[in-house]
Amino acid sequence: MILKSFILGNLVSLCMKIINSVVVVGLYYGFLTTFSMGPSYLFLLRARVIEEGEEGTEKKVSATTGFITGQLMMFISIYYAPLHLALGRPHTITVLALPYLLFHFFWNNHKHFFDYGSTTRNSMRNLSIQCVFLNNLIFQLFNHFILPSSMLVRLVNIYMFRCNNKMLFVTSSFVGWLIGHILFMKWVGLILVWIQQNNSLRSNKYIRSNKYLVSELRNSMARIFSILLFITCVYSLGRIPSPIFTKKLKETSETEEREEETDVEIETTPETKGTKQEQEGSTEEDPSSSLFSEEKENPDKIDETEEIRVNGKEKTKDEFHFHFKETCYKNRPVYETFYLDGNQENSKLEIFLDKKDKDLVWFEKPRVTILFDYKRWNRPFRYIKNDQFKNAVRKEMSQYFFSTCRSDGKERISFTYPPSLSTFLEMIQRKMSLFTTEKLSSDELYNHWNYNNEQKKKNLSNEFINRVEVLDKGFRVLNILEKKTRLCNDETKKEYLPKIYDPFLSGLYRGKVNFFFSPSIINEISIKNYIEMLWINKIYLILLISNYQEFEPKMEDRIRILKFLFDAIIVDSKNKKIVKKSTEIKKEISKQIPRWSYKLIDDLEQQEGENEENAAEDHEIRSRKAKRVVIFTDNQENPDSNTYNNSKTKDTTNFDQTGEVALIRYSQQSDFRRDIIKGSMRTQRRKIAILKLFQANLHSPLFLDRIDKFLFFAFDTSELMKIMFINWMCKNAEFTISDSTYTEEKTKESDKKEKEEIKNRREEDKREEKVRIEIAETWDSIIFAQAIRGCVLVIQSILRKYILLPSLIIAKNMIRMLLFQIPEWSEDLKDWNREMHVKCTYNGVQLSETEFPKNWLTDGIQIKILFPFRLQPWHRSKFKFLSKDPIKKKRQKNDFCFLTVWGMEAELPFGSPRKELSLFEPIFKKLKKKIRKLKKNGFLTLTILKEKRKLFLHLPKETKNWFIKGILFLKEIINKFSKSKRNPILLFGFREVYELNETKNEKNSPINNRTIHKFSTSIRSMDWINYSLTEKKMKDLNARTKTIRNQIEKITKEKKKRFLISERNISPNKLSYNAKRLKFKSSKNILQILKRNNAQLVRKSYFFIKILIEKIYIDILLAIINIPRINVQFFLESPRKMINKYIYMYNKKENNKRIDKTNQNTPIHFISIIKKALNYSNFNKNSKIFYNITSLSQAYVFYKLSQVQVINLYKLRSVLQYHGASLFLKNEIKDYFGVQGRFQFKLKDTNFRNSVMNEWKNWVRSNYQYKYDLSQIRWSSLISQKWRNRMNQQHMIQNKDLNKWNLYDKDQLIHYEKQNNFEVDSLSNQKDNFKKYYRYNILLYKSINYEDKKDSSIYELPFQLNNKQELFYNYKIDKRKLFDMSGGIPVNKHLTEDDIIDTEKSSHRKYLDWRILHFGLRKKVDIESWIDTGTKQKKNLFDWMGMNEEILDRPTSNLEFWFFPKFVILCNAYKIKSWVIPIKLLFLNFNGTKNVSENKKINKKKNNDPFISISSNETKSIQLKNQNHEEKESEDQVDLESVLVNQEKDVEEDYVRSDRKERRKKKQYKSNTEAELDFLLKRYLCFQLRWDDSLNEKIINNIKIYCLLLRLTNPREIIISSIQRGELSLDILMIQKDLTLTELMKKGILIIESTRLSVKNDGKFIMYQTINILLVHKRKQQINQRYRKKNYIDKKNFTESIVINQSLTRNKDKNNYDLLVPENLLSSKHRRELRILISFNSKNGNDINTEIINNNNIKNHAHIIDKSKRFDRDKNKLIKLKLFLWPNYRLEDLACINRYWFDTNNASRFSMIRIHICPRLKIR
């Protein structure tokens, strides 16, 4: 068994060794390389497939030989550096590929030119065989790849650095590739044999019919292969950067060099920005990532005139100085700092160079570097800016760069070596004689490394031992602990650099911040001093590096040079000649290398920065294609002119030096180069297809089905299938709609149609806009098209204005004169003069009539016609247009248009020409009307004549019957009217639906009342204009005519029958007979009324004349046809109209307005009245009744109500008490009944249509216990009882005179001053409190008793308090609006947060706008001060907490919808500071009466400047946006910062003090800018300012109108028309100049919203969070633990003091048990360094820190733990764990090793894989 296991183990280990051996791995990687196919395979396959015969065999052999030879050369080039340099450079591939491709095509197309005619088999003169060999060889060297990734080939290169026996690996990988290649060729051969032997292919009809197909295919195969080769070559070369045309690294000249030199902190391993390189070209596409590109290069290759591009200029080495910051040695950073004079602000320091040096540059250029600069550093693909820390713009290169470094005393290959450092060291070694080129042996290096490590370890150990010894002597521990080293600016004053700039502070504060000189300091003296200082530091840094080696010979010379330089510079530091000396030295020892630029600018930034002194020469980021269109030039000298700048919209504006306002017009074309840095290599967009001529966005082929297709792609079967299916369904469907759902179906259909129409209209608008954009871009892209189009437009404008239109006017008036009509010269000329031709920019910005836009011939022009002339056949009076439909008014065309190239009119630029109104269209319309009237009249006369003829034929028989029918009919009417007095409910006169089918079921006959109500309200909401409603009217008219005819026939048949209510069927147009009788009676009194009211009859004579005409018409024409019909019509129409006139005249005495028009067709629905009245009706329940009131008059119904002596209106109370906007009840009628005492006068409703007031009142009534988001106890204790009683009395005030009310309120306030028992008198500023009560008074009055007032425009009377007068003047009072909040501006502009009237928005509002309360975040303390703080403090505290809960529980979304937003502020305030608000109030109330005194101090310090009261402005800004919960963190952070200032003091007192100081500071600003800065920095750290999105478009439209108005002398007409069209919005008019941030936020232009960026948690924030938890814990401990023991440290013996301190487990305030770990005496950096050095100690592996442990003065801390029996068990485990983790195996050590030891660039990419890849340390 043992033998078997041993054999098995050996076999496994043997297999593992074989698998891991270099040969097997090489074979495997080589085999994988076979699958990376290049274009050379095309030649190989062509030789295999096509060639036949002996010559074909030779070609096959030569192709295979060339192919294998090329691959072998590629493998060898990996190992052999010269061959790698020859083949690996990008320019070698370019130089070889282009000529060879030309030769190859020439060879294929002119084959016989090279053919010498010799066909001998062994002849070497046959060049075709040699060419096959060369093709395969050269194209194998080109190394293009067909597959997407070339990773398979690079696997060999990667594994090269892992193995030691590199030659064996290369050989084995080549053999593996050869095996794979042989297998592949065998597989191809087998496929060819299978094709030849396959009968199915031979039996193909097409192949058999075409005999010469194979021969033709073979002859054209060369052409096919050449095409494929060309495609692959272009495909591959497209990914290789062109070395000639790519833009070189454009450094920001000497300025940016100075920027980088003044960086305070430098890291050893620079961060690489950007992801892994995305280029997919050849292996050597990126020269900087190659292994031997810089290492093995001949140092003599670059001579003295070699140039390195900086800022796009080639400069010789004499122009540059050299300054480095990183050294390879020791892998430790070399820090440099410059102590600059003056302010270090964001400006730039210019160093002036001589022009002579620049002129010599071109002549000294080597021609090779002009064409191929392989050391060129291409730009990254994108540029990511960061305003705070600006890192260098890096190339998108791989993170891995291979170079040699020293690790563990050996030279090893590091895969994360900084490439810039490698290049830099090589250049230094070539050019500088001070650096040795001799390489030390491996033993010397290892000894040197060991020596240095020992020295460092000794130093650190000694320092540590010294600290512990000092501790033994009794010194304090705090003095012995090592502190962090800080960089000091001034040793005398002990001023340190800020933490963020301090290079010695690593980790959290690390970053690069650029400093510059301020412009005031830039002068020649400072520049020279600065240069002098720079040279001193440069020489010092360069030469100081070389004094580190003790073993190296010739050190004396270097030390001598160093001393000489230092002595000279230090002695003569003030001499100006030093600059010359240092420059001479500089020429010998220094050279500047290319530096990464820090800030790249785009085109917009370049234009904005043109006014600056140190502006950049050219932009380096390609921005969107834009054209700058100047729209206004300010000739006046006005430096404070406003600039409109908004870079997010399509149009942006900026000012130039000449005072030009310009819009930037962006092209709508797809711009693939947007935001790409110039010179950066473009990644190939393989997954993007451009299918259209104008394609705005790039699309992946994956989403091709979602793109609008071309015509030949537009055939979509799914749409056709849908249409066919719908048609099939519609054929089989049975439309059976019941009567009850008929109206609902109609409304749904109409709504659906409307939605579809709106949707279609929007889609059509989008389509038209797309077409317009394409047309505009076409004009913009064609050369000289804009100039041609502009000239044509100007010619068309002149032709239209001065030739075409005048000729049309003359022709029209001449024709009118010929037709004997009055000419209209004046009207036509007036309209012609009104037409304006305004020149606009290309995107439609209006300029003026005479001024052309700048560069209009190149940029384009539009001509806008304002008030275009319309030639009319006659002019109507303008009064007739007033009574038009509102829908028709909306559909009227705009009174402007744009001129097209063809002279047509278009509504938008490049839009489709609109249809012009024809001159003859109104003439034809009038003629058609006249013809229709003539036809109608002729038809009536013909029918009358026919009826007369029939009448005369039957006259003798009908005369008897006529008299009998008339007498019986009159008798029945009289009887019916006499009976109707007994039934009062019939006075309502309801009409009944006539049912055509009397045998219908009872369930189906009455339509549901609810559906009718829905139908009526939907019609009401559309202003009674609806297609379905008109359709219904037409159907009702037809039904009426039918029912009238049927009813007349029934009346004639039922002459002798009685009329029963339950059985009769009357048409919808007929009234009940009771109503007819009443009308008949009322008609008797008509003569008396006419005599009394002659004047009114004269006014209303039109109606009486109309009635008389109708009577005459009935008597003369229709009496002959049918006598009963005449009687019925008379009783239906004439008495009804008379009664309406009587009602009108009766109510005219009470109200001066007409209630109801005669013949009113508007449907007013009294559905709820009918619903209530049905309860006490005397009708039979089984009768089929439906109450249709579509034509019933309101006046008639209420007249009937007024006639009743005793009426019970209890059932109608719900209607009459409706507090919202009435949908069916007129206010005047309710007022009339209120006067008569029918119901309460308070039930009167306003004309306010929205239900906003109703919601407001219901909310206030339902939530009266909260009273505006305050708890009930707060509200009850807010003020004294007298004031509450007076406020409640005020709710019942019915006096409409607001001036009296204001006087009454003023008396109240003055009376308040005299009260001494008021509890809030202790506050210092009584005026503020009075104003608060006054404010609440106004709010309550307006909100609760609002509907009792008509035309309520509140005028605030001034009131005097403390001898300070405040006057308000009111402006823009709109009497047409029922509610008009006065937007009064206080004259003295003292707009503090306590002002009553708020002017943040215009007073013209369409909705209720109570904007009085200003609840701020900190104003909650002021609310607290209103309350009696001396009593019930605990309840108040809990109520405040409850108040916040109430705010959270309330649905804020509903509040914001209809409520005024001031109350929502409290909710938002709680969201922002959910923790801080209650804590603050708890702290304040702990202080008892201090609250009032604090408020005294605060109120005394208030400033009257409105823009400095930041808290109020903050609240106004907070209300504008919904806040995210991210704000909690920032606000807590700011407030907790004040809590943690001093932990030893009481937390609450400190919080109150800091808050009070902060509030004082906030009021003591000198300018608006200070307020704005404080506002942004202190409060809104995680907020961002942004434009209101809806304002963007409005502002741009306003700017377009302003451009025209500024140029006009009389712009009034244009202003009015533009306001009517909606182009000019008045609410964003900037009337004032220089608006501050607070005012912009008031107007809603700037909005503060929370940032949506990801917030990186700072170390401070994490610390605050942890301390916050500790504070809470500590607070609990302090409450529970009343007795404390003081801890002390024995000064004599360190270990004894630790033993004494074992009682600390019971004392939970101190954490001194950390001192059990002695290493804590050192700083973390030195601690880490000491551990690593101890682990490197290879000689004494077991002696770990023997100096520390074996010291006599300190006992081993492990014994202390053993001896201590008083420790808790948990604490014991914790200390043991800490001793185990802390000194030896901390995670921090791994991170440190990862960064500094293994040269990893970015610590966040730390992974264990890299540790495994790196060489292991030797363990001895």
From Swiss-Prot:
Residues 256-268 have a biased composition (Acidic residues). This is Protein TIC 214. Residues 293-310 have a biased composition (Basic and acidic residues). Belongs to the TIC214 family. Part of the Tic complex. It is a multi-pass membrane protein. InterPro entries: TIC214. Residues 250-310, 744-763 are annotated as: Disordered. Keywords: Chloroplast, Membrane, Plastid, Plastid inner membrane, Protein transport, Transmembrane, Transmembrane helix, Transport. It is found in: Plastid, Chloroplast inner membrane. GO terms for cellular component: chloroplast inner membrane. It comes from the Eukaryota. The lineage of its organism: Eukaryota, Viridiplantae, Streptophyta, Embryophyta, Tracheophyta. Pfam families: Ycf1 (PF05758). It comes from Populus alba. Involved in protein precursor import into chloroplasts. May be part of an intermediate translocation complex acting as a protein-conducting channel at the inner envelope. The gene is TIC214.
